From Swiss-Prot:
Keywords noted in UniProt: Cytoplasm, DNA damage, DNA repair, Methyltransferase, Transferase
Family of the protein in this entry: Belongs to the MGMT family.
Function: Involved in the cellular defense against the biological effects of O6-methylguanine (O6-MeG) and O4-methylthymine (O4-MeT) in DNA. Repairs the methylated nucleobase in DNA by stoichiometrically transferring the methyl group to a cysteine residue in the enzyme. This is a suicide reaction: the enzyme is irreversibly inactivated.
GO CC entries: cytoplasm
Active site: residue positions: 126 (nucleophile)
Pfam families in the record: DNA_binding_1, Methyltransf_1N
Compartments, as annotated in UniProt: Cytoplasm
PANTHER family: METHYLATED-DNA--PROTEIN-CYSTEINE METHYLTRANSFERASE
Protein name: Methylated-DNA--protein-cysteine methyltransferase
Catalytic activity, EC: 2.1.1.63
Gene expressing this chain: ogt
Superkingdom of the source species: Bacteria
Amino acid sequence: MIEYRTVDSPIGLLTLAGRDPVLTNLRMVDQTYEPSRTGWTENPRAFAGAVEQLGAYFAGELTEFDIELDLRGSEFQRRVWRALQTIPYGETRSYGEIAEQIGAPGAARAVGLANGHNPIAIVVPCHRVIGASGKLTGYGGGLDRKQTLLALERRHSPASLTLFD
């Protein structure tokens, strides 16, 4: 049985879903693609650990999630999503760089499609992928949220801290 929980965050309402504690879905409530909730059961106490980690992330206190995930997609999509998880907090990569990383040079557009189908936003950091020119491009939650997440990470990134911070 799939359980879900909706929580508030600095970027709006987030819905977490899966078989607690294993997360299969994390989306912004008003995101462009919303999965069917047929057969889902609301449980306001589910995913307590994930919610706690998200709170720490938004407070700038957590740079790496430790949440059990069940990523379902094609083999190519899962390769892309695993590559996204290697992008360090506070950094970005281009679609082309991800394509190279997974051994599919020239597949930047396919990487973009896989990135757009990422079922677990924020934890699988699809917001860290940008265009080759450095421009912010597509994000299911909206470019304003993508910019907010990247700014949050830059502000709290270990690389941005100095000895006197």
